[in-house]
């Protein structure tokens, strides 16, 4: 049991570090070729920070572990919203930019409606669903890039912290090594997460919804804490909303397109599949609790954070039968 736990932890570390390297390399290359900063942030960085979830879900799907793919994507959304964003709101509520929040929120709920239609209507996540979700991702990227295309592009090479330019070979190395490390970390996480689930006698879905989801959400947690310390709580919440959208359209889209799978049955509540009665409804409820009050009052409130934290605690208790 000790070895799988250590390898699981190593997988998490590799995922996070690999993601850092990939983003650093990709961002450096983008700036080197004078791509506007807003486009870099909306595409390269956003995709890079979502790579841990993409690789874990894709690896799980290809290995025939649909429960791991599903749990990681949905669990990350629940964790991002009712734990990470909730901490930010509970500690330091802040005003929000309604206009910048509207687009990702609308895209998220439309994608969630499509996702839930497949789950409740067909009982499975099919390849056409994956293609639709990926098409939504591409459309969102195109809209975002078009909005930011007028932003002046930075000139010259990206300087390092000491004022020197970062060499091209280093940026390429960070990109390639980062991607490879993410792939290795994802395999370690999925394989050993499955072993741990069997040893503990709990469904893979539970492990994926909790431990794996929290682990792959660590980059968002670090960003949230950093933003909180610097007094930019609304920025943190904006990043989390974007990450949630990507978890639904990119992470789920990739995994389902590669290897379709049925809605997992991890456990039942009142004789009904918990995926249908708890996980997916909760995903929508916590996002609504986060975004609707913010859009209507133009402010994030402390009560939202406290309520979301209570919901997350109850969710974990139910998953582990406490």
Residue ranges and their predicted role:
Residues 1-322:
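Hydrophobic alpha-helical segments, chiefly the membrane-spanning helices
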